[in-house]
């Protein structure tokens, strides 16, 4: 029986993780559930799962949760705050930690799981985007096991030799005959829209992803293709890929989730229904496979598969992320922070859709002009850089409104 802590239990990844647990009750049990502020959803989860621990990142939300569940889940200990998140991520009795807290907020608890030597099911791409080499070094130092949950990275993982799968962040692709990794993305809801019309895109339109069911932040990131940019950075670290080994391709149908191209001309692709339960189930059961509750892909219903080059005029955020990836850790940390602030402002109608890229570019320019890569070589310096980038982004947004 594998015991789990689920960080981000009330989000879409958390829901899919619990779906896999429900499908395989003899294999998995839930020890701790953690979320941000959504007390209502957490109450429902505590009622159903009766976890040993329920944690809210927001301490006021933890107080509210305690008053709601003391009768329906009397044996659940309610905790609040970042330290509590780190505590349940590193519990001795826990085998695997689903790291699915969205954004920079997930870095510290994910790192706590790494330092406790856990099997870390990494859905929080921002942890790698923000901390890069520090994260990879910590995985090796503390003997943690890293498994990628993002559908694209999970697809790539499945197409790689076992020697690479068990040596993430340290592998040599060239030694294993791998010429390139092809990271696919749907292009989001605006891939065929007139670029001139993107200025007037509303939050409701941006979060309506054509293929995947996701939370609002990642849905907006998919619309700008910043999500693919962050995934590009994550792939660089996970697979130790050089710039000429990593490519982005738009694949509107989201049937092929990513591909690996080998030196001999072979291309291995992982395909399936666009359901996050599939990659989640693999990371939970690796190297075995379990029932994820996902219907099999019906090839007779797939129709055509199309592939396009990304248009950087349509997706400036993607270009920013790729360039930042090779500027240094300070650049990717700053870009991630700026983007979180800009997307939040857009979702709250304080910023236009195309302004997201403008804010990101301005913050990136200010940080890279004043900060050197060597200034981002510790967790403390990265968190300070994250804070500084958010402050700059907020100031720019205030000036524009």
From Swiss-Prot:
The lineage of its organism: Bacteria, Pseudomonadati, Pseudomonadota, Gammaproteobacteria, Vibrionales. It catalyses: 2-C-methyl-D-erythritol 4-phosphate + NADP(+) = 1-deoxy-D-xylulose 5-phosphate + NADPH + H(+). It comes from Vibrio parahaemolyticus serotype O3:K6 (strain RIMD 2210633). It comes from the Bacteria. Pathway: Isoprenoid biosynthesis; isopentenyl diphosphate biosynthesis via DXP pathway; isopentenyl diphosphate from 1-deoxy-D-xylulose 5-phosphate: step 1/6. The keyword Manganese applies. Belongs to the DXR family. This is 1-deoxy-D-xylulose 5-phosphate reductoisomerase. NADPH binds at residues 10-13, 36, 38, 124, 126, 215. Keywords: Isoprene biosynthesis, Manganese, Metal-binding, NADP, Oxidoreductase. Its cofactor is Mg(2+); Mn(2+). GO terms for molecular function: 1-deoxy-D-xylulose-5-phosphate reductoisomerase activity; manganese ion binding; NADPH binding. GO terms for biological process: isopentenyl diphosphate biosynthetic process, methylerythritol 4-phosphate pathway involved in terpenoid biosynthetic process. Catalyzes the NADPH-dependent rearrangement and reduction of 1-deoxy-D-xylulose-5-phosphate (DXP) to 2-C-methyl-D-erythritol 4-phosphate (MEP).
């Amino acid at each position: 029986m594998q015991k789990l802590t689920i960080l981000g239990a009330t989000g879409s990844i958390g829901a899919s993780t619990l779906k896999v647990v429900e499908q395989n009750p003899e294999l998995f049990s839930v020890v701790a559930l953690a979320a941000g502020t959504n007390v209502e959803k957490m109450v429902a989860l505590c009622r159903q799962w009766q976890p040993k621990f329920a944690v809210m990142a927001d301490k006021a939300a933890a107080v509210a949760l305690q008053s709601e569940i003391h009768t329906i889940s009397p044996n659940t200990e309610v905790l609040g705050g970042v330290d509590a998140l780190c505590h349940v991520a590193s519990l001795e009795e826990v085998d695997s930690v689903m790291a699915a807290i969205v954004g920079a907020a997930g870095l510290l608890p994910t790192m706590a799981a790494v330092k406790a030597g856990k099997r870390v099911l990494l859905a929080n791409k921002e942890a790698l985007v923000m901390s890069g080499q520090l994260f990879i070094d910590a995985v090796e130092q503390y003997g943690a096991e890293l498994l990628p949950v993002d559908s694209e990275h999970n697809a790539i993982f499945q197409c790689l030799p076992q020697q690479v799968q068990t040596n993430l962040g340290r592998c040599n692709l060239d030694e294993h005959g791998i010429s390139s990794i092809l990271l696919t993305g749907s292009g989001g809801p605006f891939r065929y829209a007139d670029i001139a019309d993107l200025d007037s895109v509303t939050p409701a339109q941006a979060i309506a992803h054509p293929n995947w069911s996701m939370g609002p932040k990642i849905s907006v990131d998919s619309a700008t293709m910043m999500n693919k940019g962050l995934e590009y950075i994550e792939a660089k670290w996970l697979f130790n890929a050089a710039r000429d080994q990593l490519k982005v391709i738009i694949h509107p149908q989201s049937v092929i989730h990513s591909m690996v191209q080998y030196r001999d001309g072979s291309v291995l692709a992982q395909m399936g229904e666009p359901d996050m339960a599939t990659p989640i189930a693999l990371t939970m059961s690796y190297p075995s496979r379990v029932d994820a509750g996902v219907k099999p892909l019906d090839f007779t219903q797939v129709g055509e598969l199309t592939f396009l080059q990304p248009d950087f005029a349509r997706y400036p955020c993607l270009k920013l992320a790729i360039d930042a990836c090779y500027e240094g850790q300070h650049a990717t940390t700053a870009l991630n922070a700026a983007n979180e602030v800009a997307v939040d402002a857009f979702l709250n109608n304080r910023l236009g859709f195309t302004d997201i890229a403008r804010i990101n570019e301005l913050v990136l320019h200010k940080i890279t002009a004043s900060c050197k890569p060597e200034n981002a070589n510790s967790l403390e310096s990265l968190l300070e850089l994250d804070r500084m980038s958010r402050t700059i982004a907020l100031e720019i947004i205030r000036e524009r409104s």
